[in-house]
Amino acid sequence: MKKRKTVKKRYVIALVIVIAGLITLWRILNAPVPTYQTLIVRPGDLQQSVLATGKLDALRKVDVGAQVSGQLKTLSVAIGDKVKKDQLLGVIDPEQAENQIKEVEATLMELRAQRQQAEAELKLARVTYSRQQRLAQTQAVSLQDLDTAATEMAVKQAQIGTIDAQIKRNQASLDTAKTNLDYTRIVAPMAGEVTQITTLQGQTVIAAQQAPNILTLADMSTMLVKAQVSEADVIHLKPGQKAWFTVLGDPLTRYEGQIKDVLPTPEKVNDAIFYYARFEVPNPNGLLRLDMTAQVHIQLTDVKNVLTIPLSALGDPVGDNRYKVKLLRNGETREREVTIGARNDTDVEIVKGLEAGDEVVIGEAKPGAAQ
């Protein structure tokens, strides 16, 4: 009886083992085949750029000030007006400068009259001295009288020298007064557009220490872009690199130029250090305006017709610029070592290790997802 139970128990165990084996085999045979997201390696172009935010300014901008004090009697322009070089912009009350000219001219007339009188007196003194010399030879006059005549002649000569010096000084004052009269006319130092008016008509300007600003002119035909670049990126920049930008109102239009310079003085913004890279762009249609925000791209590298793969295809690093990548062949994956070159935020150049047509694994597809 015991023997029969033992045999039956063995049959049950064997049956369980067989069933478990069959289940395992079924699972293996019906397990989903792993699928991968892949990409065929092909030649292409690769660009590496620095992204930055910038502001637009006019390449040439000048503050037009007053060099004399007085009331701004006339202001002939308004904000937005386009002016030509030497065009009259405004007039400061010229009365004070005109009165100064009249005063100096009157002083000069008086000095010239004094000089004529002094010349006549000098002529008389010379005649008197000559007469005294002849009389002294016959001892008709004393030597003291002769010395007195000589002194009188020298005094008259010195008076003429003093008057000449006063005439020169007043002539310089007259030239200054005429210049100040010219300064009452505010003219445009260059062609451009009036972008700001600081002093209104009727206001009084005082030019005692520094020239007060009347208005600001900007030449909008060429714009200057100041791109704010982080300290991590600025070390890669140099003059001559290609740069382009778009503006918020027209993101499809690219405005292109070349880096002009990188300002050496940084700016600190919320404990972050930034430098300014500048470049110029033409603005023939006047679409670009002051203080517009620019989305700037500065091109660091531009390689043509090279093999590239996505950065996501790179595996573990194995050395300087060397990585492992997975290739898919006949449904099986294998690793290969590659050497990389230029890279940007999405792709990388393959210098060595892959050929055009190779299929690289960039990820594993989820069950039920298409390759």
Swiss-Prot record:
Residues 92-137 form a coiled coil. The keyword Transmembrane helix applies. GO terms for molecular function: efflux transmembrane transporter activity. SUPFAM superfamilies: HlyD-like secretion proteins. The chain crosses the membrane at residues 11-31. Residues 32-371 are periplasmic. Residues 1-10 are cytoplasmic. It is found in: Cell inner membrane. Part of the tripartite efflux system MacAB-TolC. MacA stimulates the ATPase activity of MacB by promoting the closed ATP-bound state of MacB, increases the capacity of MacB to bind macrolides such as erythromycin, and provides a physical link between MacB and TolC. Confers resistance against macrolides. Homohexamer. Part of the tripartite efflux system MacAB-TolC, which is composed of an inner membrane transporter, MacB, a periplasmic membrane fusion protein, MacA, and an outer membrane component, TolC. The complex forms a large protein conduit and can translocate molecules across both the inner and outer membranes. MacA interacts with MacB and TolC. Belongs to the membrane fusion protein (MFP) (TC 8.A.1) family. This is Macrolide export protein MacA.
